[in-house]
Amino acid sequence: MKLFLCSHFSSVGSLIKEEIGNKKVAFIPTASLREGYTGYVGSARKLFKKLGAIVTEIDISTEAYSTIQSVFEDADVIYFTGGNSFFLIDQLRKTGTDELLKKELAKGKLMIGESAGAIICAPSIQYIEQMDEKPEDYSQEDDAGLDLIDFYVLPHYLTAPFKKVTEKIMTEFSDLNLCPINNRQGIVIDGEGSKVICKD
């Protein structure tokens, strides 16, 4: 399975430019739909364009499953923007896109997860509730993540405006295998294992 997980894609995406140039990217902004600030969505769009990717944008909370399926099947890379982790995992599970994603990743496609898109890869996302408010219409009975990795990404570590909350999560969830990353770091996961890479 190939994953690139980060806090802020437009700051670190160029680290994996070989994986993106001339590739077809399914761009999923769904997590950002419930957020006030969404500047990171535009900056990610801009970077993909600059790196030569062919981008198809799709919102999994409103599109028909058949459309999502055809976009995912056609893509080389599947990218999830940041936003609200609970809203994103709810939409993935509710629509069955979670299983579709796993099927496509099993074919060797690359998933890029930014912030919420990285958080949802963990076995559970309960640890992030202090950073992400659970929506009132959250429809899942638990906080299970996609369980693609055996650790828990903590994005924006010690980075404003998340400095205090990320410190708090590190302390309160010290029993979890947390992997804190700042906005200039990314985690590369492949068959060999995982490593943190950094943008100078």
Stretches found by the model and what they are:
Residues 33, 83-86, 116-117, 158:
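Short glycine-rich anion-binding loops that position phosphate/pyrophosphate groups of nucleotides
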Residues 1-77, 81:
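N-terminal beta1-alpha1 cap of cysteine-dependent amidohydrolase-like domains
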Residues 97-159:
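Class I SAM-dependent methyltransferase SAM-binding "motif I" and its flanking Rossmann-like core
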Residues 86, 118-121, 186-188:
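Short, active-site-adjacent cap segments at secondary-structure transitions
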Residues 85-94:
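Glycine/threonine-rich flexible loop motifs
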Residues 13, 35, 88-89, 121-122, ...:
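Glycine/Thr-rich phosphate-binding loops of Rossmann-like dinucleotide-binding domains
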Residues 144-149, 153-191, 197:
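Conserved anion/nucleotide-ligand pocket segment
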